[in-house]
């Protein structure tokens, strides 16, 4: 993902999380991802991660938990709520097919990638990307859609995890 798009994407996620779920705070930031955490109890931490896809103008969201304040790196694909840790891509909570849902800032570019690759192989030029000023207005609606999906799929998962860990009341900031 191009740097200006990624910067705007993360700013939008910061704003949306602060507005919707202020209990999440930045946990760590890596080259292609940013993670927020919420210590729901002394023995349960929830995480939300936004990961940009390398070489594409796309991103995905992950939800995870751990009984200690460490990111559960080895828990991908584990969503048994009674487990000490779990981690899954948000899109996998509603989609089970071979294609994983991602959010695409430039779907027209994604659609033409095969043609662009063929053009490069043949020594032809490829269309330039839109200017950032035309891309920027697309970002917040995608972030809001991702946060709506988080509210509809991620938060209910976190509630089930909390209940399985003996937490009877989980104030999510939207209650």
PLM-predicted stretches and their roles:
Residues 1-14, 27-175:
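Intrinsically disordered, low-complexity regulatory regions enriched in serine/threonine/proline
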Residues 22-26:
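Conserved acetyl-CoA-binding loop of GNAT-fold acetyltransferases
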């Amino acid at each position: 993902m191009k740097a200006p798009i990624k910067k705007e994407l993360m700013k939008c996620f910061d704003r949306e999380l602060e507005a919707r779920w202020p209990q999440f705070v930045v946990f760590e930031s890596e080259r292609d991802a940013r993670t927020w955490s919420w210590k729901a109890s002394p023995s349960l931490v929830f995480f939300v991660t936004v990961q940009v896809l390398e070489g594409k103008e796309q991103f995905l969201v992950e939800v995870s938990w751990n009984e200690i304040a460490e990111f559960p790196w080895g828990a991908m694909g584990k969503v048994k709520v009674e487990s000490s840790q779990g981690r899954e891509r948000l899109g996998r909570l509603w989609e089970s097919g071979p294609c994983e849902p991602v959010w695409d800032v430039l779907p027209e570019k994604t659609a033409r990638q095969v043609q662009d690759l063929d053009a490069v192989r043949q020594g032809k030029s490829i269309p330039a990307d839109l200017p950032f000023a035309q891309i920027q207005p697309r970002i917040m609606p995608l972030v809001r859609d991702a946060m709506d999906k988080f509210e509809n799929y991620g938060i209910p998962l976190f509630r089930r995890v909390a209940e399985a860990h003996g937490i009877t009341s989980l104030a999510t900031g939207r209650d």
